[in-house]
Amino acid sequence: MFDFSGPKYTVNLFVPCHMDLFLPYGVQPVLSLLQKMGDVPYYNSELTCCGRQFLLRGEIDTAQELAFRLVRHFDNGYPIVCPSSDCIGYLKKYAKNLCQHSGVPAAVAHVVQDSYELCDYIVNKKHVECLNNTFNHKVFYFRSCSARNIYPSDDAMTLLKNTKGLELVTDPEMKLCCCGNGDFALHNGELTDLMLKKIVDRIKTFDVEFVTSSDLHCLQYLDAYIATRNDVNLNVVPIAEILNSEK
């Protein structure tokens, strides 16, 4: 178990593996946001995998082991915040079944019921809809599959709309998937590229400077694809950076 002696923590911060491995600097804006709202976040850099990719590959035993590890370490009464809707949506949907034989039903219920994507936590747990942040750019918000289906929420758009200087662009008709399932992309490269092309080409028509999302995995796929296109002048930015921005 983790050592919770010392500071009086108020929230657990769970950083998913795709942020820890490919976007480690992205943790700081999240920590800063939580601290600005008066929270004292507990963050353990060794706890970085929800097990989603293993379950998608059919590796049930590993998925169960990782889910139980999260349940065990977050059994401390504090809410759990994750800056990516795919991971938190996965935990809410699958943790109960994966940990049904864990022998700690109360701890499992805590993870399922008291886990939040970052924007959801800010709006619905802290009851804050305006962070007094500034981001003087035109931004497209990509609502990923996890944000539409697994973890439906408009909280990200609420916070973006209340960002000073930000011109928000959305597309309710966009129902495309970014293929943020690593196993699918690995075995279906051409189809993945085609779907990403359709997304990026559509976003390009809005003449925006940035694209953001509450789903970090999707942002990484979009960023990697955009890097292959010389005709696309589009920057990918995690939503926490926008919400923590002062310029």
Give the location of each predicted region.
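Iron-sulfur cluster-binding electron-transfer modules in prokaryotic oxidoreductases
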Residues: 1-247
